Every structure is written in C-alpha cells, then in structure tokens.
C-alpha cells in the first residue's frame, strides 16, 4: 500500500486490504505473551485523534494501537479545543499540521470531512500528515470494514465466497457502506436486509442483493452483521415502532436457530440489546462482537504501520 491516507474503503485494492489484514495478524502474534505490550515501530511519531462525535471502540482502539507502537498519541475533541470558541475545522487542521502531527485520525458528523482534512493539510512539496477516516457522517468507516473482514477471515477461514447479510439501518450507516465496498473487493457476496425506508437511494447500483425478509436470508448466511438504528440521525419516522422493528428485523434466539452452526454474528457497536439483537444472541458463542473489538486494535496498528512506515515487515517483530 503506497497511499498516504485512508479515507474510504474504496481506496483499498484487494492486495492492499489483504496486506493490512495479514499485518494485523502479525501484530497480534508479535504481542502475544508480552508482559509489556510495546513495539518500537512508531517511536518518535505523533498521532493526533480528532473526535467530533462520541466514540468508545474506535477512539480507544486507535489510542491503544498508537501507544502499543510507541507513538505519542494526543487527543483533540470539539469541547476541549478552540473549536468550542468558534475555530473552523480547517484552522484546527492547519494548526495540528504546524505542530508536527504525523497522522490525523478524524471522526466528524459531516460526510466528506476526512477528504477535506487531507486536502487542507497537504504541503507544497506533497508532504503533510497522513489522514485516517474514523467515520464521517453517513459516508464511510474504512477501518471498521477492515476489522469486520479480519474477524470473518479468522472465524471462517476466508472472506472470498462467503455470504454476508447486513441487517438494519443501511440508510444512515457508514459501516454498511464501507463493508459493502470492502467485502465486494475481497470476493464476498453481500445481502442487505432492511425496511424500504432505511435503504439509500441508488442502492440498486451497489454490488449487493437487497431483501426485505430476514428469515429468508438467514439459512444461507455465513455471517450476519447487525446494524444499530441511528435515531440521532433521523428527522422523521422510518418505521412504526421500536417493537415492530425488532419483530421484523431483530436477531432473536428463534432467528439465530435458523443460522448454520458455523455462521457468525457481528455488530459494530454500540449494541441496542433487545432491539436489533437480543441479549442471549449477543452473548452466544456465535457472537464475534468482542473479537471485533480486539481485532480493531490490531487492524488500526496495521493501518498506521502501512501509512507511516511502509512495507518493512521486520519492523513488526522488533
């Protein structure tokens, strides 16, 4: 991977994605058994996280990834910075570039914010900090798609040829968009199951099959990715009630029994237990939710490695 930024799952070729997944596994193995989880891979590098939306898993995993690689990790939030005084995102970005950031990791409510950040911070000689999109509005979340693909590969042996059913609020989901792109790149078959009101315009042009019947899709699924209903992004009523949504599109124990024994259940979090997924299903052996969280750290280590170091595999095992 020779790119300086990771803004979209579409930035990744099949070889790029496979190399990142392979290196994520290498980082996991390099850290196994270490009492002190520290590698010198990014010693002397400065990583700044810019989170303008709430986050637990993504923010923590990027911070842990940077620290396990010995980078200096600095957090900037809207409430704790000059953004609260009216400073623009552009001025904040230029300030952080001038301060010597090697990488900027951004989550922002506006779609396209990461692309803008990359354009604003490029220097005259083409240099500048690497920008990683940690979620921009309803647009993209490429590292989530990578960790989901890694989880599928670890549990099922490969991504290619697997049937992945993505269920729920596709309309407002950056996770769904990035997963559709990356899973298609890696050779998976993707099925979207959603109420018609929660499907985006133009979905017929995506490399997916669309279904409105969850029960019909579960028996042939290798993996089921449940999406949270993003009520905070909704201005109107997209379904009659939470109960009605759960009855038609929630993954209950009864529906789980329709899955093949080998199938896995994924969720990007945060989960709304009792709505899109039941308590027992979320905690069942088929659930890979906590494995996704662990993989998030190693995938983000691999992404930082590819953007800031390059192809020196020996740097992983130091």
From Swiss-Prot:
Q: Which Pfam families match?
A: OTCace, OTCace_N
Q: Which GO terms describe its molecular function?
A: amino acid binding; aspartate carbamoyltransferase activity
> Which UniProt keywords are present, listed alphabetically?
Pyrimidine biosynthesis, Transferase
Q: Which GO terms fall under biological process for this protein?
A: 'de novo' pyrimidine nucleobase biosynthetic process; 'de novo' UMP biosynthetic process; amino acid metabolic process
Q: NCBIfam families, alphabetically?
A: asp_carb_tr, PRK00856.1
- Quaternary structure and interacting proteins, as annotated: Heterododecamer (2C3:3R2) of six catalytic PyrB chains organized as two trimers (C3), and six regulatory PyrI chains organized as three dimers (R2).
> So what does this one do?
Catalyzes the condensation of carbamoyl phosphate and aspartate to form carbamoyl aspartate and inorganic phosphate, the committed step in the de novo pyrimidine nucleotide biosynthesis pathway.
Query: What family classification does the UniProt entry report for this protein?
Result: Belongs to the aspartate/ornithine carbamoyltransferase superfamily. ATCase family.
Report the protein name in the record.
Answer: Aspartate carbamoyltransferase catalytic subunit
Q: Which organism is it from?
A: Mycolicibacterium smegmatis (strain ATCC 700084 / mc(2)155) (Mycobacterium smegmatis)
Q: Name the lineage.
A: Bacteria, Bacillati, Actinomycetota, Actinomycetes, Mycobacteriales
